[in-house]
Amino acid sequence: MTVSYLTKLKGSPAPIPSRPALKEICFISFGAFLAACVIGYLAYSTSYPIIMGSFGASIFVLFVLPESPFAQPRNVVLGHFVTTLVGLIFFQLVSSDWWSMAIALAIAIALMQILRISHPPAGSNPFIVFLLGANWDYLWMPTLIGSVLIVLVALFYNNISEVRSYPKYWNPYYITLQAWLNSSLGALL
């Protein structure tokens, strides 16, 4: 048992992913810069807290991995919303102790998977809520407003590229229904 476990730890002989072309790296980096500028400028010019620590990782996912299921708009916005809501419920209504934070994180991760809105950067939101001692307003600003803004920048910017197309889907339930209808209709014809 111990040997097989230790064998797993050494990894597999998978190659390191290739580096993107310099042109692509510049395109990605400029998109990330624009998204950070939008939320940064609005935060500083309006004095509203639109910036959230997990948004840096969200911006990475949206611009470096736009085809990933984790980068799709519903995953980004709803992932942030649900995990922040869970963090607030536990912080405000259960306890501000460490164990409450751990339970909030576990439930937030489970809900993202159940609801099919997994967005890894949003997993840090319960921790952020507890560390800041956030109140209920944190759910709307920065969580909802900020996540919508970075998705809007990603929608605009990623589609400027001739080789990128974002998003891949808005609602996976629609895609599943569409595929089922196509296969059912195809079988009838």
Label for each model-derived stretch:
Residues M1-F81, L85, I89, V94-A102, ...:
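Alpha-helical transmembrane segments and their membrane-interface boundaries
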Residues I50-L65, L105-N135:
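Pore- and pathway-forming membrane helices of multi-pass small-molecule/ion transporters and channels
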